[in-house]
Amino acid sequence: MSTADKSLSGWAPAKVNLYLHVGPPKPNGRHDLESLVMFSGSGAADHLTAEPAEGLSLSVAGPFAAAAGAGDDNLVLQAARALQAASGTQQGARLSLKKWLPVAAGIGGGSSDAATALRLLTKLWALDPNHAIALAPGLGGDVPVALAGQPSLMRGEGERVTPLPALPPVYAVLVNPGVPCPTGPVFRDHDAAGGGAGFAEIDPPPEFSGPKAFAAWLGQQRNDLESPAIARVPEIGAVLEFLRAQPGVLLARMSGSGATCFALCEALAFAERATAVIAHDAHKAHWWTAASRLGAAP
């Protein structure tokens, strides 16, 4: 059976910014960035299915379906329409998204959904993969790295992606305090404070003997948006304080523009223990959390 006669499905994992250096605002209002990115496993991911149809449609289910929406502003539909336009295809698809990742949370959920849509539809419609690669930057800064799906160094406005396959896989716990953190205001606060004045690209990471050496090197880096995000959403600070107090944690930091934070752990058992502690704490019952291996996208 050809791909045109069957449905395809794939995971859209969380994107974790292990560090994020942000330059000053450019004339276009955007910023040059440098970030080391890894992806969660299927235990911390959305799931997308695409099947042949006459037109394009999207349905969304799952705990964060209402926040994501299924309208024209959903990046999955935007990606599908952009791919139709770029390729000239008249084919359609029925898209079904299970939304397990929190929205506007600093882990690139919408961008990962869009990248997965591009991958699935490229196969379903039997298109040249270069169409998806070319249009990805126009969908958002995180879409190119999500489309690559590999541990990568992300530079420029997100369009310069360098895979780093030699990085050791690590284990992490992801935690979101259940409070939205607005990306635009966080960047504006960063800019108003003179952030990015000394921005310069650093050398790519060296080879590491293991997770501890990797975490030690990451500890010399930073997330430039962490302080302005905490100023707007103090709960982020509470999450980081909690994570840093857990056994087996090598590094705790915010991802992206927040509010999701992560802790790299010596082993998966430590990450799972942290999720269990949260699950049994009534004061943290509204926190979203997941334990996962970080590496290439599933």
Curated annotation (Swiss-Prot):
Protein name: 4-diphosphocytidyl-2-C-methyl-D-erythritol kinase
PANTHER family reported in the protein's UniProt record: 4-DIPHOSPHOCYTIDYL-2-C-METHYL-D-ERYTHRITOL KINASE, CHLOROPLASTIC
Keywords of the record: ATP-binding, Isoprene biosynthesis, Kinase, Nucleotide-binding, Transferase
UniProt record similarity statement: Belongs to the GHMP kinase family. IspE subfamily.
Enzyme Commission number(s) from the entry: 2.7.1.148
GO molecular-function terms, A-Z: 4-(cytidine 5'-diphospho)-2-C-methyl-D-erythritol kinase activity; ATP binding
Record-level GO BP terms: isopentenyl diphosphate biosynthetic process, methylerythritol 4-phosphate pathway; terpenoid biosynthetic process
Reactions the enzyme catalyzes: 4-CDP-2-C-methyl-D-erythritol + ATP = 4-CDP-2-C-methyl-D-erythritol 2-phosphate + ADP + H(+)
Residues that bind ATP: 102-112
Top class in the EC scheme: transferase
Active site location: 15, 142
Matches recorded under SUPFAM superfamilies: GHMP Kinase, C-terminal domain (SSF55060), Ribosomal protein S5 domain 2-like (SSF54211)
Gene3D superfamilies hit by this protein: 3.30.230.10, GHMP kinase, C-terminal domain
Gene name of the encoded protein: ispE
Pathway named in the protein's UniProt entry: Isoprenoid biosynthesis; isopentenyl diphosphate biosynthesis via DXP pathway; isopentenyl diphosphate from 1-deoxy-D-xylulose 5-phosphate: step 3/6
Function of the molecule: Catalyzes the phosphorylation of the position 2 hydroxy group of 4-diphosphocytidyl-2C-methyl-D-erythritol.
